[in-house]
């Protein structure tokens, strides 16, 4: 029988529900259980693919091409699993599917309502996440805060799950805040009490409380919270701020959270062996070297827009005992006149993905600086496209080289709309998305980065591609096309072998990086940046 764990949040948002859920998933996996995890987002968008990075942060892409919440990146990195379309469910997706069924006549003339039709669809998504992966445990995080009107159908579905699958197969975890009032010198439990009261008013009695605190909670305070919220004192789990996220699974384990969960779910498993994880935590806390990377992008005001890139850079740094210090540069503010002063002193330059014409010329200036000064460069998606345009302009002499994304009628579109995108009308969910194979050129820098593999599988998210009309012309000037689709039609990787490291990929390598298994291109880039 599949077991279900539901993680909700109260008092305020951004308490770290996603990290708690991911940490618990890691603990249960290390107990020998097969775990899957999903995020419910209460917004009306079908997915975050068309949302501004300033509002939502990064759009994380799964193997099957689903555009998802950035929390799925945390899940994949912490638990080291690959997720799917059932791992991110939005209100928009639920309503869209229910309305399609209604139009087909699937409800046989019934009045379609939130209960039971919407809640049944939500429960179907929960159960499907388990059956499609054959998981022992499904962990479901509900976005937002208890009390939000948008979350009510999801919470009602969670309430119904208890009677549907049996109380012995369900655990409810509620994350709350115990604030410290500096003026009074006291910690206050009242917000937690009220949050749990509101959750109980919706029919859900939490089994475990994870309380976010600034200072340690005393045993007497733990007892007080337990008494007012009707949980066992040992089920009140303290979650203090930490210097590295990798401490959180170990902190939860030290408070027996995974043991409490397994006992409630009648799961007889050995204790989680977290030796390797503890070693990772210790390494991260004691890095001796430093590598300075300049990240040049369009959305740098919100670093969460590049969170997987940031994490992938850090993962590669752990391998060489180096802290990767990332400084952000707004590409709109970089010019031919100031780029050298701005980027001087950095060990490497990276230009990640993005959309639209804003800030492209600044990216091109950063790429030119890296190429001409032999500073290690890694381009991702848009960063690969701009690298091709910079090379075409400044090396091949095609002065008006550009992208069809800026000017669809330009004479020299080095980057152009993919043929199968020309008749696409809807913007959402229609890009080239998900895992695709890439054939690597033997002896290339890219091939070496991946252990001389012939073919790799990487995740994509793009609508434009390199225009093959210019492949021979740029190759004659020294640009190596070191990665292509197996049929050789789509350019996936370009490089300049004369430079210390100048590699750019159309795909998004950051989505497959793990803290204990860095992604190949990122590792090669950081090695070159560190002079290894």
Curated annotation (Swiss-Prot):
Pfam families: CTP_synth_N, GATase. Catalyzes the ATP-dependent amination of UTP to CTP with either L-glutamine or ammonia as the source of nitrogen. Regulates intracellular CTP levels through interactions with the four ribonucleotide triphosphates. Pathway: Pyrimidine metabolism; CTP biosynthesis via de novo pathway; CTP from UDP: step 2/2. L-glutamine binds at residues 54, 354, 382-385, 405, 463. It comes from Ligilactobacillus salivarius (strain UCC118). GO terms for molecular function: ATP binding; CTP synthase activity; glutaminase activity; identical protein binding; metal ion binding. Signal peptide: none annotated. Residues 1-267 are annotated as: Amidoligase domain. This is CTP synthase. Keywords: ATP-binding, Glutamine amidotransferase, Ligase, Magnesium, Metal-binding, Nucleotide-binding, Pyrimidine biosynthesis. Belongs to the CTP synthase family. HAMAP family: PyrG (MF_01227). Residues 292-532 form the Glutamine amidotransferase type-1 domain. The keyword Mitochondrion does not apply. Allosterically activated by GTP, when glutamine is the substrate; GTP has no effect on the reaction when ammonia is the substrate. The allosteric effector GTP functions by stabilizing the protein conformation that binds the tetrahedral intermediate(s) formed during glutamine hydrolysis. Inhibited by the product CTP, via allosteric rather than competitive inhibition. InterPro entries: Class_I_gatase-like, CTP_synthase, CTP_synthase_N, GATASE, GATase1_CTP_Synthase, P-loop_NTPase. It is an enzyme of class 6 (ligase). The lineage of its organism: Bacteria, Bacillati, Bacillota, Bacilli, Lactobacillales. ATP binds at residues 14-19, 71. It comes from the Bacteria. Its EC number is 6.3.4.2. The gene is pyrG. Homotetramer. The active site is at 381 (nucleophile), 508, 510.
């Amino acid at each position: 029988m599949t077991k279900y764990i539901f993680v909700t949040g109260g008092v305020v948002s951004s308490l770290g529900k996603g990290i708690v859920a991911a940490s618990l998933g890691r603990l249960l996996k290390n107990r020998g259980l097969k775990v899957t995890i999903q995020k419910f987002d209460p917004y009306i968008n079908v997915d975050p693919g068309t949302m501004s990075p300033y509002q939502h942060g990064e759009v994380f892409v799964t193997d099957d091409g689903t555009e998802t919440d950035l929390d799925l990146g945390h899940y994949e990195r912490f638990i080291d699993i690959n997720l799917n379309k059932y791992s991110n469910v939005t209100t928009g997706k639920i309503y869209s599917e229910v309305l399609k069924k209604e139009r087909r006549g699937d409800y046989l003339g019934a009045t379609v309502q939130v209960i039971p039709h919407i809640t049944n669809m939500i429960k179907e998504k929960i159960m499907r996440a388990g059956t499609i992966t054959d998981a022992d445990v499904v962990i479901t995080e509900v976005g937002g805060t208890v009390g939000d009107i948008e979350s009510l159908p999801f919470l009602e579905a969670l309430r119904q799950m208890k009677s549907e699958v049996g109380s012995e197969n369900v655990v409810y975890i509620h994350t709350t805040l115990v604030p410290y009032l500096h003026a009074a010198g006291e910690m206050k439990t009242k917000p937690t009490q009220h949050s749990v009261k509101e959750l109980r008013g919706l029919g859900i009695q939490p089994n475990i409380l994870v309380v976010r605190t600034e200072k340690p909670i005393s045993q007497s305070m733990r007892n007080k919270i337990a008494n007012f919220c009707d949980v066992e004192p040992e089920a009140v789990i303290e979650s203090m701020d930490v210097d590295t996220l990798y401490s959180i699974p170990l902190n939860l384990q030290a408070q027996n959270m995974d043991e409490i969960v397994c006992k409630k779910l009648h799961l007889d498993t050995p204790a989680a062996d977290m030796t390797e994880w503890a070693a990772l935590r210790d390494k991260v806390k004691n890095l001796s070297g430093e590598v300075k990377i300049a990240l040049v992008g369009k959305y740098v005001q919100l670093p969460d827009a590049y969170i997987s890139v940031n994490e992938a850079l850090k993962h590669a740094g752990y391998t060489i005992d180096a802290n990767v210090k990332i400084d952000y540069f707004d590409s709109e503010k970089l010019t031919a006149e100031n780029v050298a002063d701005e980027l001087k002193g950095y060990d490497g330059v990276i230009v990640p993905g993005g959309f639209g014409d804003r800030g492209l010329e600044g990216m091109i200036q950063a790429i030119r600086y890296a190429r001409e000064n032999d500073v290690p460069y890694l381009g991702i998606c848009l960063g690969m496209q701009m690298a091709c345009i910079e090379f075409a302009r400044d090396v091949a002499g095609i002065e008006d080289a550009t992208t069809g994304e800026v000017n669809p009628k330009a004479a020299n579109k080095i980057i152009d709309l993919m043929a199968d995108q020309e008749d696409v009308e809807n913007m959402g969910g229609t890009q080239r998305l998900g895992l695709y194979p890439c054939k690597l050129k033997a002896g290339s820098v890219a091939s070496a980065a991946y252990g001389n593999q012939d073919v790799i599988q990487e995740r994509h998210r793009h609508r434009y591609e390199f225009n093959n009309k210019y492949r021979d012309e740029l190759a004659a000037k020294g640009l190596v096309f070191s990665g292509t689709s197996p049929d050789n039609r789509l350019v996936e990787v370009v490089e300049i072998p004369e430079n210390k490291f100048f590699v750019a990929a159309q795909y998004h390598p950051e989505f497959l990086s793990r803290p204990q298994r860095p992604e190949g291109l990122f590792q090669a880039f950081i090695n070159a940046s560190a002079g290894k």
